Amino acid sequence: MSNEKMENLLNLALDATEREREKSLDLDTGYDRAERTWEVIVKFGGTEEALRGLFAEKFPEEYDRIRITNLRNEYAILLLPEHIVELVAALTEIEYMEKPKLLFFAVNNGRRVSCINQLQTVGTEQGTLSSGRNLSGTGVIVAVIDSGIDYTHPDFRNADGTTRILNLWDQTIPADSVADPFPAENGETSFLGAPSGYFLGTEFTRAVIDRALEQTTERERFALCPSRDISGHGTHVTGIAAGNGRASQGRYRGVAYESPLLIVKLGTPGERSFPRTTELMQAVDYCIRKAQEYGMPIVINLSFGNNYGSHSGNSLLESYLDDMANYWRTSIVAGSGNEGASAVHASGTLRENITKDVEIAVSSYEPSLNLQIWKNYSDEIAVSLIHPNGTRVGPVRQILGPQRFRLGNTDILLYYGEPSPYSPYQEIYFDLLPVNEYIDSGVWTIQLVPQRIAAGNYDMWLPAGGVLNEGTGFLMPSEETTLTIPSTAARVITVGAYDGYFDRAAAFSGRGYTRETNQVKPDLVAPGVDITSCAPGGGYVTRSGTSMAAPFVTGGAALLMQWGDGDIIRLR
């Protein structure tokens, strides 16, 4: 199967066997084995009503199993029975379709080195700092889409003990599983559900959170609002962007300390896995809709990413975020990722008659590994894969559809991509899957033999370093174009990390240019080394990463929008 209106990874996932999908890091994402359904992202033409009518007409027997989550600007998340995915993609109204990708958090004296103090005057309640313009984020929403929040932490509460959180959408808590603390007029018990227009998780309003905070015991609080931040990542990020420092008498106060908060905990009910891009897109849509309801400008913080894609800014996720950054009074901030020193990117320029060997070290106990090669379609290259024991497959045929090989105790799944409306570059995708539990360790080699070269540039990416074992990576990596997606989006404010103690960029910080488009990224850097911020339980913890750098800029953007009365056009 090969459909040019579907991305390569989705084409391959539909062609892969169930065993191959289960063994792969990426191919299974978005597939529900029990229901035999796929979650996909689409860009379509027309209205939601027209799309629903089209599905009812074309797929009457399956219509009750089709779920549409409509996003702004003609994007949607669809849940489709497996056997109609390709048929839906072939519809004239569907412009392009992608599968979800996993997202990984970018974790590896912030306020002072960010020059925030000079913009604020602090009252005696939270200590005295040098006076400035007294910007605090008032009237500008800070939205954090992350691992959740400890809503009981003093830094996210007002002086009277009430919450600063306008709404909390926990995508991991099934709808209708939490009783509404405010009984219906007839006295019957009702249950909290997903936000209007969405099917995922449970939404908690400010009133519900305040009712939970009124309770005297932790058990009573979490019975009313059971949302927790297990990893502490989202709590830490929110504290940097907008914590008010009440638990530390102002010592660890965040940037936009009076901004109202919107919180989305990413995830899927019942799954213990990384969040997906489909959940992120719904979260962004939700936050902007809420900002419009409240009539306030909004800054959205994204402190995670992934490595799948051409890194050129043209995937549906990146295009969607670019569109949303121009919608309402919205700024979107993303960390550049922590792949700068993780050996997951290699690049070079091929010349005719000169063979290029790219070596990849694979450590022991690696359950699977995938590799993307991105090149110009006009370049003809013979590609071979060489096992650590010297056996090889290739040169592989440049044909559409999956190709399968076995080297040692490792199965190889290969897919050659073709042109598509959202991908003008060619992808060659290798998925190394274990015959038993682990793929073969040692040094693998990708051999590139130029046949006919027009441009010659190539880039290779492995998965984000956070999911690889230590020691797995390219032996000759490139530190450039190590941005994670979606920080490659053109209109997203991309933030790298620097070390404020030594006044230099952090080695782990992802960096550009973006591939082919050559856009300079990150747009700016912020403190990202040894940053102290909020931790679940009411205290503080120190962390490093571009996850910690991005919220400094998120808070700073809120101050700027407060100063400019939310006039995003003038501020740009």
Residues of each region from the PLM?
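Autoinhibitory N-terminal propeptides
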Residues: 1-76, 83-131, 161, 269
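Substrate-binding/charge-relay-adjacent region of secreted/lumenal peptidase catalytic domains
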Residues: 173-176, 194, 202, 206-207, ...
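Active-site-adjacent substrate-recognition loops and nearby beta-strands
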Residues: 157, 308-318, 339-376, 380-402, ...
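Subtilisin-like serine protease catalytic core
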Residues: 128-278, 295, 329, 367-369, ...
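Short acidic, glycine-rich surface-loop motifs adjacent to enzyme active sites
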Residues: 264-266, 284-312, 335-336, 447-451, ...
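Active-site glycine-centered loops adjacent to acidic/histidine catalytic or metal-binding residues
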Residues: 146, 337, 545
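C-terminal subdomain of the subtilisin-like protease fold in secreted/lumenal serine endopeptidases
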Residues: 27-30, 293, 297-306, 328-330, ...
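Hydrolase catalytic cores
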Residues: 238-241, 249, 262-270, 288-298, ...
